[in-house]
Amino acid sequence: MRKIAIDAMGGENAPEAIVEAVLKAKPELPEDKFIFFGDEGKMKELLPADDDQIEIVATTEVILDEDEPVKAMRTKKDSSMVVAANWVKEGKADALLSLGNTGALLTCGIFIVGRIKGVARPGLMPTMPVESSDDGFNIIDVGANATSKPEYLLQWAEMASCYAEKVRGVSKPRVALLNNGAEFDKGDDLHKEVYQLLQDSSLNFTGNIEGHELLQGKADVVVTDGFTGNAVLKSIEGTGSVIIHMLKDGLLNNGVKAKLGALLAKDALKSVASRFDKDKYGGAVLLGLNSPVVKQHGRSDARAVYYAVKQIDKILTEDLTNTFKQEFSK
């Protein structure tokens, strides 16, 4: 039975939303066991007793969003996140899911779970929506690394392409390099060198992609440095929130005609909202570690966490980590 470590105390809606999500997913995943790390009293109130798929590990501390990541990992040794990461390191759990402090989770992933031998730097990779289909695209790195070298981006592209193929079911994933122009000689020295490395690789490299093309479905995997990727991710998320707010305000607060228009456009608006629903893709994966570590947004509700649980099950089913270990040990 596969064992998934759940940081039950991370996120704004913990532990209730996390427990609700796991209990919803559990009947669909009979081969998985869920190990909850957190406040034992709260866990016992929310979880069924005598369930072979559920285990509770009592912890006494919580890493907060305002905590400094490295210091939190070192000083809050009995926090739900740190204890869960140690269980994964020791082989008592196969994967880790957390909604907690992103920096702390990255730190725990890198320094406790550990890098795969041969991987220079792990990369953080979410799946984002596109306008043309429900397939979405992966973008890596979105903030695990402040600085980058060409070989890092090549490895991220290789791992992300493998993820897109095995977990998302994309045949021959199209890999693109985020750059400031489509031409091969665009960008700084880093991007020019990465372009050549990708072109010389066995990946299905389609060239550069510009920021305005990201949501158009032109690539299945987009590789970028962590600084740029983080800025792009937050820009996409922020723009989406603003558009939704503006639509709601415009349709509901501009008289009877606007409300009638909203009613007539209801199905179309639902279709658009569904297409750009990033929750259905699960969380962001820290690729390149000895075991899967998935970060879901701290504000996630039970529905979003449910998809992250299903995502981890798929990653374990496809044995993605061992694929990476075999590839990078050559």
From Swiss-Prot:
GO MF entries = phosphate:acyl-[acyl carrier protein] acyltransferase activity
Catalytic activity reads:
a fatty acyl-[ACP] + phosphate = an acyl phosphate + holo-[ACP]
Chief localization: cytoplasm
Q: Where in the cell is it found?
A: Cytoplasm
Record GO cellular component, one term: cytoplasm
Q: Name one GO biological process term.
A: phospholipid biosynthetic process
Pathway field of the UniProt record reads:
Lipid metabolism; phospholipid metabolism
Q: Which InterPro entries match?
A: FA_synthesis, Phospholipid_synth_PlsX-like
Q: What is its EC number?
A: 2.3.1.274
Family annotation (Pfam families): FA_synthesis
How would you classify this enzyme at the top EC level?
Answer: transferase
Free-text function comment from the UniProt entry = Catalyzes the reversible formation of acyl-phosphate (acyl-PO(4)) from acyl-[acyl-carrier-protein] (acyl-ACP). This enzyme utilizes acyl-ACP as fatty acyl donor, but not acyl-CoA.
Q: Which family does it belong to?
A: Belongs to the PlsX family.
Q: How does it assemble?
A: Homodimer. Probably interacts with PlsY.
Q: What is this protein called?
A: Phosphate acyltransferase
The species is Lactobacillus delbrueckii subsp. bulgaricus (strain ATCC BAA-365 / Lb-18)
